[in-house]
Amino acid sequence: MQLRQFWTHRELIYFFAVRDLKVRYKQAFLGVAWAAIQPLVGAVAFTILFHGLADVDIAGRSYFAFALLGFGVWTYYSTTLQSGTGSLVYNAELLTKVAFPRVVAPSAALLPGLVDLAVAMLLATVIGLASGGGASAVSLVVGLPVGLLMLVIAVAGPVLFLSASLVKYRDASALVTFGLQFLLFVSPVAYPPEFVPAGWRVLLYVNPLAGALGLLRAALVNTPLPSIGSLSLSGAVAVIVLFVGLLHFRRSELEFADII
């Protein structure tokens, strides 16, 4: 499997992504309004629990905007990981009847959640500006595209690995559920990296989600940029996991049609 397959079959990936997006909001009473409601409700919960009760502060910046963006990023990561893990099993009938690169299904799962994420980012930016925040042009130009790229890569590797694993081992879905519960607490979703003791902070950035969150928050709600060393660590781990996922997927895909 070669990386150029992603570009060669971009139209098929787009078709799968649009189909999944339509299914998500089909017959929903509030429709796409859920894209705004979910991060707002999540941010309210985080604000009450962490800012109100645990006294987590963001050095004069809007904690609500900080939490809203964190919840939006987390929602993208968790829902994409869950849907991507099941993408091959969900499309089992197509896999056995239609000849197309199997990598299309998990790749398409990376896209629908970006719509909800864009809404959360817009809301966080507006609220941050309204509360007197606002990032520099450099943070915006660098942090936004690099942060989004790191986020997508951070979830793409696990999606490829786990989607291939679920075909053969159906209890892989239970691993995803447990893993996400653990990851939520060890990721700076509702708290800033400074909340973690300095001696342990380097371990925080072994998690690529921490690097992506740091870049996106610096770009949109004007939090300090993480150090180059921290971002390099997160980026390196994300790329390594991506290639491990690609390798595992390539070795497993010949058995997909036979097992499903």
Language-model-derived ranges and their functions:
Residues 1-260:
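Hydrophobic transmembrane alpha-helices and immediately adjacent juxtamembrane helices
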